[in-house]
Amino acid sequence: MAAAADAAIASRARERLIPARDAAARALEEAREDEAQWLELEEKISHLRSRAVPDDGFDALVDVGGGVHARGRATSASRVFVDVGLGFRAEMTLEEAETRARRGAERARDDGERARRELEEIGRVMGDVVDYLRSASTVGGG
């Protein structure tokens, strides 16, 4: 009787904890990728601000979609277009873009920290289930 109850506990734990662990691991990886992208944007903006841009602009490679770039002429470096999600780009000053990048990186860090804590908690619960099942099998004569 106890063995059937233990098997049910193990089965229920597998059904719930493993998918939750996998989802938390994916969330952590996505948060790390997001943070890296925001930090890269912040670095590019900083580089653009530090360049001495001539009054008549500068040549640049322009992303035209699908991984294709074309040579273009940027007439000003004071405003940039930032991907704000869902395929939308917003025109911003360098200061606005830098603030957006900083906030995005902070949000991604917070999301990653939440996912990391959730992963740790799931790991603790999984360990508790394993410990319980081991002790139950020892007490039950297994």
Question: Which residues fall in each region the model found?
Answer:
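Intrinsically disordered, low-complexity regulatory regions in eukaryotic proteins
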Residues: 1-142
